[in-house]
Curated annotation (Swiss-Prot):
Entry function: One of the primary rRNA binding proteins, it binds directly to 16S rRNA where it helps nucleate assembly of the platform of the 30S subunit by binding and bridging several RNA helices of the 16S rRNA.
Gene3D superfamilies reported in the protein's UniProt record: 6.10.250.3130, S15/NS1, RNA-binding
GO terms (BP aspect): translation
Pfam families named among the record's database cross-references: Ribosomal_S15
Assembly description: Part of the 30S ribosomal subunit. Forms a bridge to the 50S subunit in the 70S ribosome, contacting the 23S rRNA.
Name of the molecule in the record: Small ribosomal subunit protein uS15
CDD domains reported for this sequence: Ribosomal_S15p_S13e
HAMAP family: Ribosomal_uS15_B
Name of the gene: rpsO
GO CC field: cytosolic small ribosomal subunit
Keyword NAD: no
InterPro entries documented for this protein: Ribosomal_uS15 (IPR000589), Ribosomal_uS15_bac-type (IPR005290), uS15_NS1_RNA-bd_sf (IPR009068)
UniProt keyword terms in alphabetical order: Ribonucleoprotein, Ribosomal protein, RNA-binding, rRNA-binding
Amino acid sequence: MSLSTEAKAKILADFGRCENDTGSTEVQVALLTAQINHLQAHFKEHIHDHHSRRGLLRMVSSRRKLTAYLKRTDLARYTALIQKLGLRR
């Protein structure tokens, strides 16, 4: 249930600050969002997959913490990221 290498490379190209940027907050949030969206599609078919649902909740919590950090440190980058990903907040 992980993302393909091509999907990760596309996210890195879209959200990374430079070519090899894999650790910036924007990239981490974008990767988590893609994984969360992938898992949501999985749960439409597999409703009772509680083991994976726990992992989904962990990813959502991690994304929430990262977006809160970004909002606290750089509001302009936060608002740009939220608009680009289409997240609520």
